[in-house]
């Protein structure tokens, strides 16, 4: 009898204390810093990267949430394939090179194309305004303005200033995702 009583309690307790999972898609133009961010979060190290052809996927645990992060290459020839990764995505991390003002309108077009897809309708949007350590980097307020995020209705979004090389701002981004996640 005692054993069956324990079994009845073990399932709710395991759900209470186990890690929840959240599928995250990390996109952005090539050379924005996506892969550097992924491995800074995973290994807490800066790694030398090459342009991603295809994808990298890693699990990053933060405050008992397992973020399954899919980092997909950002070269223009690869971008049409992004939609194949949309299914099941709960959060979009869109990485912007804040110091590359020449490509910010291209980044805006790609972001709005992604979030207008019906499969991405309900996902959280975290914009990482990366490379804040570089001269001339746009501020989070400027990124918000240029990406026209204020026009987004019925979507939770946040702009987090980051520096992938030092890790500045990355954990704050995960904290925002974990606080706003609708985990099942």
Curated annotation (Swiss-Prot):
SMART domains: ARF, RAB, SAR. Keywords: Cell membrane, GTP-binding, Lipoprotein, Membrane, Myristate, Nucleotide-binding. It comes from Schizosaccharomyces pombe (strain 972 / ATCC 24843) (Fission yeast). GTP binds at residues 28-35, 71-75, 130-133. This is ADP-ribosylation factor 6. PANTHER family: ADP RIBOSYLATION FACTOR-RELATED. One of its GO terms (biological process) is regulation of cytokinesis. The gene is arf6. It is a peripheral membrane protein. Its main location: membrane. It is found in: Cell membrane.
